[in-house]
From Swiss-Prot:
Disulfide bonds join C96-C109, C261-C274. Required for polar body extrusion during cytokinesis in embryo development. Affects cortical granule size. Shown to have roles in meiotic chromosome segregation, osmotic barrier function and polarization in conjunction with cpg-2. Binds chitin. It comes from the Eukaryota. Residues 284-312, 658-686 are annotated as: Disordered. It holds the Pfam family CBM_14. This is Chondroitin proteoglycan 1. Keywords: Cell cycle, Cell division, Chitin-binding, Developmental protein, Disulfide bond, Glycoprotein, Proteoglycan, Repeat, Signal. GO terms for molecular function: chitin binding. Residues 1-18 form the signal peptide. PROSITE patterns: CHIT_BIND_II. Residues 63-120, 228-285 form the Chitin-binding type-2 domain. One of its GO terms (biological process) is embryo development ending in birth or egg hatching. GO terms for cellular component: extracellular region.
């Protein structure tokens, strides 16, 4: 016996590590056997205690050293209710329940009369009791008829296949216990005409169905229809299919789960419990079809419980000859009084091994499909547009195709068409949106029918604050029809900047390609008729330069009207050299908006647009040079025009009118001469 201190230390180490993993413990286990002769002859020390265990000199010493052993189960005696388990080098001793004996062949606890090592009284093992599995051990059979047993440990699925051999009066015993794939060794003794109890033992909680079919003496197999022991078409619950058996099934969501009653109890489907066979209606008077063998008949005794086997019945077994077994068929068995609750598969043969196949009958891995499925939405080319009040940091690019646009408006908010002129637009609220619009080539035609009288000077009313807008128009034939139009312009390559009251990170850029603009002007201009600008034109100074135009101009006295309050607006009109006649085929005219403007106003030099190798380019350049030359020659007129920005009284306006009249009275011949000089000067420079 080991000292208690050693056992206490072993238990402390075991509890601290808690290593119960025994993966692979059923394969390639080392076989150990401690065989003790229990004859008791000559020892003088063998005594039996009240429990029937042997004490004295033949008691088995326990080897608890797991330092050199692999993880697994090991026998500690030839016939012992205890066994040793090794896990991570830690040894534990475990006891079999219910007076069972550990059988190292099947790695399970078994009745003593089924353990070859217990050919008598089981031995006593002095140790501290614990629970653990053990190893597999095989003891050679003596030269007597010994049942060939195959027992599988619980919780490892197996399928037992039995082979029929020639007819001999040698019973072969097969014990199947599912859920334990192990290698099973079969010991076969020479055939003798000795009747040996034939019994099948299944470890608790190991559902296995073994079918035995009695065949004729000529070994012809009998085919039976296999019962459909599945959950097809059955509601959730427990079913034994009307048979007297310790095996039943549980149905859950259409899945079949094999189950087994413990301790040789039978399943009562009506009460859904496991009970003694005598209390199960299916097992009474042969009403149930028990799946046992025809050669096993148990006579129920009327004595008090329990009987010698520990249950409420006694078993009497007789061996049958020449009965092959066919697995998987429902047997035809007639039970008298009581039928044992275990199916028996028997093979009558000499030297016939039993093969155990690692197969789990009716074991289904359960798969649960929940109603809630990951949702997949398939839309047929459906685009979703979400409108959000605040959409930060979104860049939108819009490309417009070629559009021929005609605009007619009575009162239109100003749109500016110019080359390289930025436009500023104020938006109430456009948060964090960058929009780029590319407009292709647009051909625009504007028709203007206008009668202008030089005597009438444009009248500016309203409040026009501090905005200077310069528009340069290349040589264009222009026709404009307007009643009251706030200026509409189309520009080539004009970026538009949008300023938003609350617009973080928003930039809107509009790129307009080259636009060929054709303007046809059919105009009879009378100086007295000048367009009057009314309304609210904020901060704009507009300077218009008109290239070569055929125009008839009647110059009369120019009237300048001063509005009570028109701050920071200067409109200047300069009339260049004019061929005066009833119809003048060739007129070079420069028109500059004349407006009253404070000294803060800045003059903006307009870019020149050149079209090489074109008549329009030459005429435009010629007109531009002509305007410059005429302005240089006519010092009085130019000075008066420049000084008109600072006129503040009626006398100054009258003086400006006289200067213009003097300029217009210049002779045609002198104007022609100056024009020729300007042409020559232009050709020299180009």
């Amino acid at each position: 016996m080991l000292p208690k201190s050693v056992l206490i230390v072993a238990f402390l180490v075991a509890s601290s590590s808690a290593q119960y993993g025994v993966t692979g413990m059923y394969e390639n286990l080392p076989l150990e056997s401690t065989t003790v002769e229990a004859s008791g002859e000559g020892s003088g020390y063998n005594e039996s205690n009240d429990d029937g265990f042997v004490t004295g000199a033949d008691a088995v010493a326990i080897d608890t050293d797991c330092s050199t052993k692999e993880d697994g189960l090991y026998a500690i005696g030839g016939c012992s209710p205890q066994f040793l388990t090794c896990s991570g080098g830690i040894a534990r001793i475990m006891d079999c329940p219910a007076n069972l004996i550990y059988d190292q062949r099947i790695i399970a606890c078994e009745y003593s009369y089924n353990v070859p090592e217990c050919s008598g009284v089981p031995q006593d093992v002095s140790s501290t009791q614990a629970y653990y599995p053990a190893t597999e051990e095989t003891t050679p059979a003596e030269n007597v008829t010994v049942p060939a047993e195959t027992t599988v440990d619980p919780y490892a699925p197996v399928e037992v296949a039995t082979t029929a051999a020639p007819s001999e009066d040698v019973p072969v015993e097969t014990t199947a216990s599912p859920y334990a794939p192990v290698e099973v060794e079969t010991t076969t003794a020479p055939a003798e005409d000795v009747t040996v109890p034939e019994e099948t033992t299944v470890a608790p909680y190991a559902p296995v169905e073994v079918y035995t079919t009695a065949a004729p003496a000529n070994d012809e197999p009998v085919t039976r229809t296999l019962l459909d022991k599945t959950c097809n078409g059955k509601a959730d619950g427990f079913y034994s299919f009307g048979q007297c058996s310790d095996h039943y099934i549980a149905c859950s969501n259409g899945y079949t789960i094999p189950m087994q009653c413990p301790a040789r109890l039978s399943f009562d489907e009506a009460r859904v419990i496991c009970d003694y066979t005598m209390n199960v209606p299916e097992c009474q008077n042969g009403s149930g079809n028990y799946e046992g063998s025809a050669e096993e008949t148990t006579t129920e005794a009327s004595g008090e419980l329990p009987y010698s086997n520990g249950y409420g019945y006694e078993e009497t077994t007789t061996a049958a000859a020449d009965v092959p077994s066919t697995e998987g068929y429902a047997p035809e068995t007639t039970a008298e009084a009581w039928v044992a609750p275990y199916r028996l598969e028997s093979t009558t043969a000499a030297d016939v091994p039993t093969t155990t196949v690692g197969y789990a009958p009716e074991v289904i891995e359960e798969t649960t499909t929940s109603e809630y499925v990951e949702e997949t939405t398939t839309a047929a080319d459906v685009s979703t547009t979400t409108t959000v009040e605040y959409v930060p940091e979104v860049t939108e690019t819009t490309t417009a195709p070629y559009v021929e646009e005609t605009t007619t408006a009575e009162y239109v908010e100003e749109t500016t068409t110019a080359a390289d002129v930025p436009t500023t637009t104020t938006v109430a609220y456009a948060p964090e949106v960058t929009e780029t619009t590319t407009v292709p080539y647009i051909e625009e035609t504007t028709t203007v029918e206008e009668a202008t009288t030089a005597a009438d000077v444009p009248t500016t009313t309203g409040y026009v604050p501090e905005v200077i807008e310069t528009t340069t128009t290349p040589y264009v034939e222009e026709t404009t029809t307007a009643e009251y139009v706030e200026e509409t312009s189309t520009a080539a390559d004009v970026p538009t900047t949008t300023t938003v009251a609350y617009a973080p990170e928003v930039t809107e850029t509009t790129t307009v390609p080259y636009i060929e603009e054709t303007t046809t002007v059919e105009e009879a201009t009378t100086a007295a008729d000048v367009p009057t600008t009314t309304g609210y034109v904020p901060e704009v100074i507009e300077t218009t330069t008109t290239p070569y135009v055929e125009e008839t101009t009647t110059v009369e006295e120019t009237t300048t009207t001063t509005v009570a309050y028109a701050p920071e607006v200067v409109e200047t009109t300069t009339t260049p050299y004019v061929e005066e006649s009833t119809t003048t085929p060739y007129v070079e005219e420069t028109t500059t908006a004349l407006m009253f403007h404070p000294p803060q106003s800045k003059a903006t030099k307009l870019p020149q647009i050149h079209h090489p190798a074109s008549k329009e380019h030459l005429l435009s350049s010629h007109a531009h040079k002509t305007i410059e030359t005429v302005s240089m020659d006519m010092n009085l007129s130019s000075s008066a025009s420049r000084d008109s920005s600072s006129l503040q009284s009626k006398d100054d306006a009258q003086l400006l009118t006289k200067l213009r009249s003097a300029t217009n009275r210049t002779s045609t011949k002198e104007a022609t001469t100056r024009t020729q000089n300007m042409h020559a000067h232009y050709h020299r420079n180009h």
